[in-house]
């Protein structure tokens, strides 16, 4: 793709990996080729020139005169960078963690397990800060960059969201601002595929985030697109996704996950997502995407970072100081918090919502992006800088308590609001009626009764792991075999934690956490 750069002249070495949605705008502004535009941006703005870029990217600049390396990622880190530097000044970096760990191994540098990082994965399902599972190997945090001169490395931030609130706006004005920013983000993504002649992939589920994207794309005239979903068959997710696709007229493709096969590719998933989160997180996404012809498809539009229905990832204490014991955002249910389950970035966020928006939304939720990038270019319009700024400038109370984002859908996309939301069984339009709230309460009570009676119903969940394993005992046999073959790779407290997670009566997802960490040892530490 012509968005990428790998070139040099007498002054600079330029490396840019990614999809730049405003490339043509920048070429016009700086009156030159893409390479010339990037050089002018750097010469005018210095080490924070990447502030002008929009899209999915990471990159590096070497300034030959200043003998300075600059490394950077985009504001939400869709294309991560990993790096190592020791007290001797030895440095390595790469867009995949194995590039760094393989370089360490080739140079005789010992690769030691980071107990803090791996403990966080075993509890939360993901890393909680810039750490990895390897000591001295870090991941560049979203919106950060590195400046390296000789043996000196300095980490700085060029972009971070803040909870600055717009005041004095009416509900309708907030909605207009959200909609304008969102439509512009989707428009840029569609136009990028049009630039290269690719079809756009639109993920559709039973939720409302993906639905917002699909209806916006249709309103913008996007025709060269397909819609996809993957889930347990017979459930609400597939029925609602199909209804959305049929209503919009997009070709619709569905992959059933009934056989639970997404639990088997432990090593492949951990390798491709850099071991950054639980390996089952993508469920059937990889199996689906690898069926597609990569010559035909460009951007995959996902609803990650959305939370249109709830209005926030944090539905209580959103404006309080950040804390870690937010039970909603931990995959594990067996292990307790301990002295290793902490976060070194807790203090950089002003409130609880922002902390979890970055950790759960970007570090965990978007951990599947590097895996997807083997097949397509995943993007989320909810991660567009201008949209995020409007979103975060809208008061938390208004977004959550008054469900402003649901009202946005009802006002701007009324047809989408008349289709039920899989999680509640009611439509977003009914959310503001007594009848709708009553229906939601009845559904909640029914599900709670089933839970208390230990009745597993495949229709309630998009990815019913416990149901799959009950129906197919060979899945648990596989997980146990993988554990037995690899358990000696771990040691100390990590090994003890793995033993607890692999007991017969532990949930499947806890076992998946154990396998994730063992695969991490196998591929990045041994």
Stretches found by the model and what they are:
Residues 415-504:
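PAPS-dependent sulfotransferase catalytic core
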Residues 1-204, 208-260:
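Cysteine-centered catalytic environments shared across enzyme families
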Residues 23, 34-36, 46, 97, ...:
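Alpha-helix initiation and N-capping motif
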Residues 143, 297, 512:
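Active-site lining segments that contact anionic ligands and/or coordinate catalytic metals
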Residues 55-56, 361-364, 462, 466:
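Short, motif-level signal for alpha-helix interfacial/capping segments enriched in acidic residues
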Residues 65-70, 85-87, 150, 157-419, ...:
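ATP-dependent adenylate-handling active sites, centered on carboxylate activation for C-N bond formation
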Residues 492-526:
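C-terminal non-catalytic accessory extensions
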